[in-house]
Amino acid sequence: MDTLTHLSHTLREAMSDIVPESHPEHPFNLIPELCRKFYDLGWATGTGGGISIKMGENYYIAPSGVQKERIKPNEIFVLNASQDVVEEPRTEKQLKISECTPLFFNAYRMRGAGACLHTHSANCVLISLLCDREFRISHIEMIKGIINNETKKALGFRDTLVIPIIENTDFERDLTASMAECMERYPESCAVLVRRHGMYVWSDTWQKAKGAVECIDYLMGLAIRMRTLGLEWEPKDVK
């Protein structure tokens, strides 16, 4: 393959994930849609939660302190890899960039993520109160929907899902260092729980991140019900 052909092929690969702003899967449109879905699930009520998606060399992030179910495409911030805002929201509203931004970039820098999602799910908060340093569960079918961050392969039915827990802080940005340290200690995990607060989940693509957060929240809700019934989260006698 000559140099020109190689460069052309490389450019096509780099552009393959970039779609026009009118496309429903462009982050300007996708982030508001996902925020509405998360709001309906109770994961982003009261202006809580956050969503960030990478496309090309840009990072798209929802604003902070707004009604997440009412975010519009022209209200999204665009950042570069240095966390500099390269495009302000195209609105007259005085919007503030998400407090989650440095935590999103933990996932981008340390995991090469394509998306990072932050929820304030009640299931996450309850699990963080029931567990000490980790949430662990095995032998549940929905575990198969979660990717091992190191091997990039899906977990199996008999595998144990392990999600670490860090302590909450008064300000979101102050979680940055403890989240990064936790990610170093748990290289296989695609999520971090914040006690009495919520959860961060990331993956290579927004589709995988969305699937992971849905599976994890399901498993946490199930675990809470299992606890009330006296059922073990890591049973030893399952065939």
UniProtKB/Swiss-Prot annotation:
InterPro entries the UniProt entry points to: Aldolase_II/adducin_N, Aldolase_II/adducin_N_sf, MethylthioRu-1-P_deHdtase_MtnB, Salvage_MtnB_euk
Catalytic activity reported: 5-(methylsulfanyl)-D-ribulose 1-phosphate = 5-methylsulfanyl-2,3-dioxopentyl phosphate + H2O
Cofactor note: Binds 1 zinc ion per subunit.
Assigned EC number: 4.2.1.109
Cofactor(s) of this protein: Zn(2+)
Active-site residue numbers: E141
A matching Pfam family: Aldolase_II
Keywords: Amino-acid biosynthesis, Cytoplasm, Lyase, Metal-binding, Methionine biosynthesis, Zinc
Domain of life: Eukaryota
Keyword Amino-acid biosynthesis among record annotations: yes
GO molecular function: methylthioribulose 1-phosphate dehydratase activity; zinc ion binding
Subcellular location field: Cytoplasm
Protein purpose: Catalyzes the dehydration of methylthioribulose-1-phosphate (MTRu-1-P) into 2,3-diketo-5-methylthiopentyl-1-phosphate (DK-MTP-1-P).
Assigned protein family: Belongs to the aldolase class II family. MtnB subfamily.
Protein name in UniProt: Probable methylthioribulose-1-phosphate dehydratase
Protein source organism: Leishmania major
